[in-house]
Amino acid sequence: MTTITDLYPSRGAAEVSVPRQDPVLWGTPDTPGPITAADLQSYEHDGFLAVPQLIGDDEVALYHAELERLIHDPAVRADERSIVEPQSQEIRSVFEVHKISEIFAQLVRDERVVGRARQILGSDVYVHQSRINVKPGFGASGFYWHSDFETWHAEDGLPNMRTVSVSIALTENYDTNGGLMIMPGSHKTFLGCAGATPKDNYKKSLQMQDAGTPSDEALTKFADRHGIRLFTGRAGSATWFDCNCLHGSGDNITPFPRSNVFIVFNSVENTAVEPFSAPVRRPEFIGARDFTPVR
Amino acid sequence: MTTITDLYPSRGAAEVSVPRQDPVLWGTPDTPGPITAADLQSYEHDGFLAVPQLIGDDEVALYHAELERLIHDPAVRADERSIVEPQSQEIRSVFEVHKISEIFAQLVRDERVVGRARQILGSDVYVHQSRINVKPGFGASGFYWHSDFETWHAEDGLPNMRTVSVSIALTENYDTNGGLMIMPGSHKTFLGCAGATPKDNYKKSLQMQDAGTPSDEALTKFADRHGIRLFTGRAGSATWFDCNCLHGSGDNITPFPRSNVFIVFNSVENTAVEPFSAPVRRPEFIGARDFTPVR
């Protein structure tokens, strides 16, 4: 266990909610980067920022083709970093994609991407986690409400809320095919969940959130206070969101699949220590221990 | 089995798609009723008509209170017309609500409601089915794609597509809480589904569509051709839709429950005969045999 003060206790006997102890924006107004001052303010307030077109159509085609190549590569399929859906035997996610694929590594180093992360986190950044997600339609389940930070803190040992994620759409997100939902402003409250972390929890939690799931009462309070925003947008659009946003997604009964690349940047001044509420670290391809700044 | 010509074969060995053999609008331009000519045309084209406010806030309060009274009445709970969700033991639907509750009976007789049905179907109408639906949040599942007519024809013996449904919202339908989705224009093609009707299929099909479910291939073709429209709207809004619209709903992971009253009007010139593709009739509270015109 970590001896640093645990600002965000979780996975204890009872659910407990505490105000955020960290800023949302760690940079200063003159921290360089592509995000406008107005957008920074709305990110600070809501906890997210929707970018209608982060990458162009030709780049979407490039990354989508690379995604298809990876998920059809037997070597990638055999790699423990690939998450295969039992029934269909189809790949749902490939982790550490920035290490497996040079094309996705370039995307991580792209100033439109890493530049925004540095600007928000006010420092150099490294990749805490990256993955490509391939979510089919025809009833594929969504992902229930959770805060990523609650898991990254409890199971990966990230001390502070100085982490930001970006989900870049490689297919269109309609209002019908189970897109990302966020409760705007929920990032300003930390919800410590009840229930100890089971051993090897990560194996299950990649398919379905269980440990670290808010109670119905908490969800009702959050939703009544904050409402819920659904993110739609064309392929190439992106959603930046603070590590402590309460988010989830519904199932997708449409025939329209959803693919995206998901990158988590963490400040080099917030590197992972030992898990705050879990018996063991998660594997490095899920919670990085390589803190090399993105260059 | 019925000896009338079966215009819409289904539940055979293979899935088969045939063009609609019936008009969508059975009235003539001078058939009286509240729907404008332009709205009638859009209903003919899309197969549905969204009415932003069919009933007022005070009426919503009245009907919502009546819904709450019914689902908390032990006698209603014990009635076979109530569908109780096994795990939570909560009532999900109450059928034949227009017979159980005089308040809902008045709604059925309301000219804003039955007047629209007569106008669309070009004749007197009776209630083929009515129910109140109470769909909680927190992950309650939706209802997969299906055409109601496919079931009403196969299992209730409705000969022709001369039936219209209205879903009147008693709570707000957001873009996040698993609202009704329809493929606009899908009503102009009948999709006969593969697979015989199991005995007592209705007991299962009230919770989850199984017999009468389109294949992935068919859904992909329909969705590519027609797209998918999600219906949102405040409490008091309503969606009228043709009996052969391909429709479904996703799950609801939000805390916001969805309640509605669902009424199916059938033309008195299209009364039920014997099922076209099922061994036995469904119970009368699901597929009426009382053809008394609504007055």
Curated annotation (Swiss-Prot), chains A, B:
L-ectoine binds at Q129. The record marks W152 as: Important for ectoine stabilization. The keyword Transmembrane helix does not apply. GO terms for biological process: ectoine catabolic process. Its cofactor is Fe(2+). It catalyses: L-ectoine + 2-oxoglutarate + O2 = 5-hydroxyectoine + succinate + CO2. It is an enzyme of class 1 (oxidoreductase). InterPro entries: EctD, Phytyl_CoA_dOase-like. 2-oxoglutarate binds at K135. PANTHER family: ECTOINE DIOXYGENASE, PHYTANOYL-COA DIOXYGENASE DOMAIN CONTAINING 1. Homodimer. Involved in the biosynthesis of 5-hydroxyectoine, called compatible solute, which helps organisms to survive extreme osmotic stress by acting as a highly soluble organic osmolyte. Catalyzes the 2-oxoglutarate-dependent selective hydroxylation of L-ectoine to yield (4S,5S)-5-hydroxyectoine. This is Ectoine dioxygenase.
